[in-house]
Amino acid sequence: MIRIGHGFDVHAFGEDRPLIIGGVEVPYHTGFIAHSDGDVALHALTDAILGAAALGDIGKLFPDTDMQYKNADSRGLLREAFRQVQEKGYKIGNVDITIIAQAPKMRPHIDAMRAKIAEDIQCDIEQVNVKATTTEKLGFTGRQEGIACEAVALLIRQ
């Protein structure tokens, strides 16, 4: 059986902390306002794999009202979500992530993001695609107020 899931996340800029996207620290003058580390790419991907396995969403599994997830490393959240997906008998077919940001530029960091994601979801790097786009200076991402991200995941029954 093949199952597909979709995820979406958005965070505003505004915290004095590192900007983490796709498990990689991206040099920028500000970080995200978020309960965890705010990694929009990994949050969207976590939602996509949970959705594909009918396991709910990131907020159900890791509620932002629970202090144990305060400043949590999103790579750990993704790994735990993937562990639960594996328990249901699924492996990754492929994942595709689109980061929507006017700034900072993602291109120099995409290969590192792909490698970390592949490690976390136990698949080959060729099964992980990460790309970035802008909104041509339109909307909140265009005004550089934050970043949005979409992800899709294809799961295959093992």
UniProtKB/Swiss-Prot annotation:
The keyword Lyase applies. Binds 1 divalent metal cation per subunit. Keywords: Isoprene biosynthesis, Lyase, Metal-binding. GO terms for molecular function: 2-C-methyl-D-erythritol 2,4-cyclodiphosphate synthase activity; metal ion binding. Its cofactor is a divalent metal cation. The keyword Nuclease does not apply. A divalent metal cation binds at residues 9, 11, 43. Pathway: Isoprenoid biosynthesis; isopentenyl diphosphate biosynthesis via DXP pathway; isopentenyl diphosphate from 1-deoxy-D-xylulose 5-phosphate: step 4/6. The record marks 35, 134 as: Transition state stabilizer. One of its GO terms (biological process) is isopentenyl diphosphate biosynthetic process, methylerythritol 4-phosphate pathway. It holds the Pfam family YgbB. 4-CDP-2-C-methyl-D-erythritol 2-phosphate binds at residues 9-11, 35-36, 57-59, 62-66, 133-136, 140, 143. Its EC number is 4.6.1.12. Involved in the biosynthesis of isopentenyl diphosphate (IPP) and dimethylallyl diphosphate (DMAPP), two major building blocks of isoprenoid compounds. Catalyzes the conversion of 4-diphosphocytidyl-2-C-methyl-D-erythritol 2-phosphate (CDP-ME2P) to 2-C-methyl-D-erythritol 2,4-cyclodiphosphate (ME-CPP) with a corresponding release of cytidine 5-monophosphate (CMP). Belongs to the IspF family. Homotrimer. This is 2-C-methyl-D-erythritol 2,4-cyclodiphosphate synthase. It comes from Haemophilus influenzae (strain PittGG). The lineage of its organism: Bacteria, Pseudomonadati, Pseudomonadota, Gammaproteobacteria, Pasteurellales. The gene is ispF.
